[in-house]
Each structure stands twice: as structure tokens, then as C-alpha cells.
């Protein structure tokens, strides 16, 4: 019997994944930390108030850049997800009871950090009658109430595509409603067994029909083929997706899905071009791009492309439109030059 480091018995899929060693990264999977005054200010505020963000706790490679833009991400609903995805490092199992005071605390954290844009994400809560819809909506409302000049992005589960639950979330009026598709139909059930490809598209379509700015994410390197990525992008565009992020899968541990391929920056650029051609309004594509990376900038870009004015209280987000993005594929090519084929091999560490 295989067990985890904390003594838990491994799931069958985890034991199978663990047979493949952790992979060695190619040269373009690198970060360069540049620390500016906004980052230092937020870091001092977080440390002084004992705050917690996904940015720090997940060791996000883009924390310096996002905090310099005064953006951060918060995980709500607890630390245990009622579903398991083969790429995700959040533990799965029976979640703890809901913390009804969490919306207030998150909103106060946003105020304490002086954020211009906040992304709210969280675990799936199939154990609750409303699957956590109240919580996702209430956090948005509280942030807007205490922080009228802060944009809010709500990155949610699918709420089983129940219209009455989606409406609760939509009515909270986040600047962006996000639901991540993550991968292509052929391998979807293997990677996200508790989700459904078509259902995720229907959730995005519902948000689009409601009138919200919509967003999704694709993770590459889990076994998909290049042409399948293009087809998934088209599906997202047809569902009314305004913003798309595309990223390289990085394996959290040996118990997670092995990396099938390292996707070159050149291919990320091709997918970005395809997304724009298919009508998606704002795209960020690169190996270390994450779904909340430069989120305020992407919101502002999407609003402009939709022909809509950015609200006066969020005009400051326009300042980010011309800033450089260190993790976009085009920037990586300028930094490292053309890529060579990099087969997936075991790490020497």
C-alpha cells in the first residue's frame, strides 16, 4: 500500500502518477524577480497585519509583478475541495463547515493591502445545498462595499450549471466572471473527472448572456494535441469568452498528472494569435502565465475591445495597458531567443 508523506493512503491514480519521476524544466521556465515600491508596500502591509494570499502560499512565480500592479488573489471556502482534479495541488475530501465571516475578512484584507484589483477563487463545495454560491457572491459584494475603487474577478466552480445558483453569483456583479475550462475534450474526464467539458462551456455562455465580462483558462502539457487546443479555443470563443489565459502545466508533486510535453513559447504565441482571430478580446499566453496574471490589465483590455467604457472608479486600471508583461511568450522569445526541442526527462534534483 502506497501512502503520502502525511500518512494518507494514496488514491489509485496518485500511485500510478507517482511511478513517473518529477520532470526537469526547460530553460524558458524561469522567473526574474524585480522588486518595486508597490510590491514592498504590499509585502509590508501583509506582514504587519498577518494577512494570507494565494500569491504567497502557492509560491506564485508572478507575485512580484502582480503586487507591483497592486493585484492579489484570495482562496475562499476552506482548504479542502469536494472534487479532485489531477493537476491541482489543493487537497480533496470532506470540507470544513463554511466560515460565514470570511467575506468580511477578505474585504478588509483587500482594503488593508490597498489593492486595485482582486481575484477571488476557491474550492468546490458540493457538500453545500447552494454549492458555495452565496459565499462567492457575498465576497464580491463585501469587497465592493469596502473598496469601491477595487475591481473584482470571481473565478468560480461550475455550481453544477444550476441556473438559480449561477444567478446568485452573477447578481453580485463582479467586474469579471471566470470559470476555467483547463483542457480539451479527449482527456477532460481523465484530468477533471468531476467536471464536464460541455457544462463548463454552458456556464461561461450563461455569464456572457447575462452581460458579464467572461474569462477562462487552458493548461497545456497534460496530453493534449496542438490542433485540439485550437478547437478548444474556438469552443470558448463560441461560448462568449472575452478573456483567455493559456499556461504550461507544472506538476505540483509526483502524485499529480505527469507532464506530457514542454510547450514552446512559439506555440503559445500561435495559440494567442488564434484566440484573437476567433474573436476573444484579451489574451495572455505563456509558460508561466497563470489565470490571475495581470488580471486588471486584461479586464481593461477586454472592456475596450467590447467598446465599453471602463467605470470612473476603475479608470486607474487603464494605466496597466501599456506596461510590459514578463511572462508573455513574446517577451520570453526576446529574452531567450528561439526555442529548441526539449523532451520531457526526469529532474536530476
Swiss-Prot record:
Binding site for [4Fe-4S] cluster 1: 55, 60, 66, 292
Binding note for cofactor: Binds 2 [4Fe-4S] clusters per subunit. One cluster is coordinated with 3 cysteines and an exchangeable S-adenosyl-L-methionine.
Domain Radical SAM core: 67-281
Positions of transmembrane segments: none
Subcellular localization, as worded in the UniProt entry: Cytoplasm
SUPFAM superfamilies referenced in this protein's UniProt entry, alphabetically: Radical SAM enzymes
EC annotation from Swiss-Prot or TrEMBL: 2.8.1.8
GO molecular function: 4 iron, 4 sulfur cluster binding; lipoate synthase activity; metal ion binding
Protein name: Lipoyl synthase
Amino acid at each position: 500500500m502506497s501512502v503520502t508523506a502525511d500518512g494518507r493512503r494514496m488514491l489509485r491514480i496518485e500511485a500510478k502518477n507517482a511511478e513517473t519521476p518529477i520532470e526537469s524544466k526547460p530553460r524558458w521556465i524561469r522567473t526574474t524577480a524585480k522588486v518595486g515600491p508597490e510590491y514592498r508596500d504590499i509585502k509590508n502591509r501583509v506582514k504587519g497585519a498577518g494577512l494570507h494570499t494565494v500569491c504567497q502560499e502557492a509560491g506564485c512565480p508572478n507575485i512580484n509583478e502582480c503586487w507591483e500592479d497592486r493585484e492579489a488573489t484570495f482562496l475562499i471556502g476552506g482548504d479542502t475541495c469536494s472534487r479532485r482534479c489531477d493537476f491541482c495541488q489543493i487537497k480533496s475530501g470532506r470540507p470544513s463547515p463554511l466560515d460565514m465571516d470570511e467575506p468580511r475578512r477578505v474585504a478588509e484584507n483587500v482594503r488593508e493591502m490597498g489593492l486595485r484589483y482582486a481575484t477571488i477563487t476557491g474550492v468546490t463545495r458540493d457538500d453545500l445545498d447552494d454549492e458555495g454560491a452565496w459565499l462567492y457572491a457575498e465576497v464580491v459584494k463585501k469587497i465592493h462595499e469596502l473598496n469601491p475603487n477595487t475591481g473584482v474577478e470571481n473565478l468560480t466552480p461550475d455550481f453544477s450549471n444550476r441556473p438559480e445558483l449561477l444567478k446568485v453569483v452573477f447578481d453580485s456583479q463582479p467586474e469579471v466572471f471566470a470559470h476555467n475550462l483547463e483542457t480539451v475534450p479527449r482527456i477532460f474526464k481523465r484530468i477533471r473527472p468531476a467536471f464536464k467539458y460541455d457544462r463548463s462551456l454552458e456556464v461561461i455562455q450563461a455569464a456572457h448572456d447575462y452581460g458579464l465580462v467572461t474569462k477562462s483558462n487552458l493548461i497545456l502539457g497534460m496530453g493534449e494535441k496542438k490542433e485540439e487546443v485550437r478547437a478548444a479555443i474556438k469552443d470558448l470563443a463560441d461560448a462568449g469568452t472575452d478573456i483567455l489565459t493559456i499556461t504550461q502545466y507544472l506538476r505540483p508533486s509526483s502524485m499529480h498528472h505527469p507532464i506530457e510535453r514542454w510547450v514552446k513559447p512559439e506555440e503559445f504565441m500561435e495559440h494567442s494569435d488564434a484566440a484573437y482571430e476567433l474573436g476573444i478580446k484579451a489574451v495572455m499566453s505563456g509558460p508561466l502565465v497563470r489565470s490571475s496574471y495581470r488580471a486588471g490589465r486584461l479586464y481593461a483590455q477586454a472592456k475596450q475591445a467590447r467598446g465599453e467604457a471602463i467605470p470612473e472608479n476603475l479608470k486607474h486600471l487603464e494605466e496597466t495597458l501599456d506596461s510590459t508583461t514578463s511572462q508573455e511568450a513574446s517577451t520570453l522569445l526576446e529574452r531567450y531567443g528561439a526555442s529548441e526541442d526539449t523532451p520531457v526527462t526526469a529532474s536530476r534534483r
